[in-house]
Curated annotation (Swiss-Prot):
Disruption phenotype: RNAi-mediated knockdown extends lifespan. Belongs to the insulin family. Residues 1-18 form the signal peptide. Insulin-like peptide which plays a role in ageing as a consequence of daf-16 activity. GO terms for biological process: olfactory learning. It comes from Caenorhabditis elegans. GO terms for molecular function: hormone activity. It comes from the Eukaryota. Its main location: secreted. Disulfide bonds join C61-C90, C73-C103, C77-C104, C89-C94. The keyword Signal applies. The keyword Disulfide bond applies. This is Insulin-like peptide 7.
Length: 105
Protein backbone atom coordinates (compact mmCIF):
# COMPACT_ATOMS: atom_id res chain seq x y z
CA UNK A 1 0.00 0.00 0.00
CA UNK A 2 1.46 3.43 -0.89
CA UNK A 3 2.48 5.53 2.12
CA UNK A 4 0.14 8.43 1.26
CA UNK A 5 -2.91 6.20 1.46
CA UNK A 6 -1.65 4.74 4.71
CA UNK A 7 -1.27 8.25 6.18
CA UNK A 8 -4.78 9.08 5.03
CA UNK A 9 -6.30 6.08 6.80
CA UNK A 10 -4.20 6.39 9.95
CA UNK A 11 -4.33 10.16 10.52
CA UNK A 12 -7.03 12.01 8.63
CA UNK A 13 -10.00 9.71 9.10
CA UNK A 14 -9.72 9.42 12.91
CA UNK A 15 -8.99 13.15 13.19
CA UNK A 16 -12.04 14.10 11.15
CA UNK A 17 -14.32 11.98 13.32
CA UNK A 18 -13.05 13.58 16.52
CA UNK A 19 -13.43 17.15 15.26
CA UNK A 20 -16.69 18.57 16.70
CA UNK A 21 -18.02 20.13 13.51
CA UNK A 22 -21.67 19.96 12.56
CA UNK A 23 -22.95 21.33 9.28
CA UNK A 24 -26.49 21.49 10.64
CA UNK A 25 -25.50 23.81 13.48
CA UNK A 26 -23.50 25.96 11.06
CA UNK A 27 -26.52 26.22 8.74
CA UNK A 28 -28.76 27.13 11.67
CA UNK A 29 -26.33 29.85 12.72
CA UNK A 30 -26.19 31.30 9.19
CA UNK A 31 -29.99 31.31 8.93
CA UNK A 32 -30.33 33.02 12.33
CA UNK A 33 -27.85 35.72 11.31
CA UNK A 34 -29.73 36.32 8.04
CA UNK A 35 -33.05 36.63 9.89
CA UNK A 36 -31.58 39.15 12.34
CA UNK A 37 -30.03 41.15 9.49
CA UNK A 38 -33.34 41.18 7.61
CA UNK A 39 -35.22 42.39 10.68
CA UNK A 40 -32.69 45.17 11.27
CA UNK A 41 -32.91 46.33 7.65
CA UNK A 42 -36.67 46.70 7.95
CA UNK A 43 -36.45 48.64 11.21
CA UNK A 44 -33.89 51.21 10.01
CA UNK A 45 -35.49 54.25 8.42
CA UNK A 46 -34.07 55.88 5.35
CA UNK A 47 -32.47 59.28 5.88
CA UNK A 48 -32.85 60.41 2.26
CA UNK A 49 -35.64 62.52 0.90
CA UNK A 50 -38.51 60.52 -0.39
CA UNK A 51 -38.27 59.86 -4.11
CA UNK A 52 -41.70 58.39 -4.68
CA UNK A 53 -43.87 61.03 -6.37
CA UNK A 54 -47.22 62.14 -5.04
CA UNK A 55 -50.24 61.77 -7.28
CA UNK A 56 -50.03 65.23 -8.86
CA UNK A 57 -46.46 66.37 -8.25
CA UNK A 58 -43.50 65.10 -10.24
CA UNK A 59 -40.13 65.04 -8.51
CA UNK A 60 -36.98 64.62 -10.54
CA UNK A 61 -33.78 63.30 -8.96
CA UNK A 62 -30.40 62.21 -10.28
CA UNK A 63 -30.40 61.33 -13.97
CA UNK A 64 -34.01 62.41 -14.38
CA UNK A 65 -33.18 66.05 -13.66
CA UNK A 66 -30.29 65.88 -16.13
CA UNK A 67 -32.57 64.49 -18.84
CA UNK A 68 -35.25 67.05 -17.97
CA UNK A 69 -32.80 69.96 -18.35
CA UNK A 70 -31.73 68.59 -21.75
CA UNK A 71 -35.39 68.35 -22.79
CA UNK A 72 -36.16 71.93 -21.71
CA UNK A 73 -32.94 73.75 -22.70
CA UNK A 74 -31.53 71.49 -25.39
CA UNK A 75 -28.14 71.33 -23.63
CA UNK A 76 -26.56 71.01 -20.20
CA UNK A 77 -27.35 73.49 -17.45
CA UNK A 78 -25.32 76.73 -17.53
CA UNK A 79 -26.38 78.25 -14.23
CA UNK A 80 -24.89 81.48 -12.92
CA UNK A 81 -26.94 81.42 -9.73
CA UNK A 82 -26.28 79.75 -6.38
CA UNK A 83 -29.43 77.61 -6.63
CA UNK A 84 -28.82 73.85 -6.60
CA UNK A 85 -31.54 72.65 -8.95
CA UNK A 86 -30.77 68.96 -8.32
CA UNK A 87 -31.60 69.25 -4.62
CA UNK A 88 -34.55 71.59 -5.16
CA UNK A 89 -36.20 69.47 -7.87
CA UNK A 90 -35.72 66.30 -5.84
CA UNK A 91 -37.50 67.82 -2.82
CA UNK A 92 -40.24 69.71 -4.64
CA UNK A 93 -41.75 69.97 -8.08
CA UNK A 94 -39.82 72.04 -10.64
CA UNK A 95 -41.57 73.64 -13.57
CA UNK A 96 -40.25 74.28 -17.08
CA UNK A 97 -40.13 78.01 -16.33
CA UNK A 98 -37.94 77.46 -13.26
CA UNK A 99 -35.51 75.32 -15.28
CA UNK A 100 -35.40 77.92 -18.07
CA UNK A 101 -34.66 80.74 -15.60
CA UNK A 102 -31.93 78.77 -13.83
CA UNK A 103 -30.23 76.90 -16.69
CA UNK A 104 -31.03 78.19 -20.15
CA UNK A 105 -29.00 81.20 -21.33
Amino acid sequence: MPPIILVFFLVLIPASQQYPFSLESLNDQIINEEVIEYMLENSIRSSRTRRVPDEKKIYRCGRRIHSYVFAVCGKACESNTEVNIASKCCREECTDDFIRKQCCP
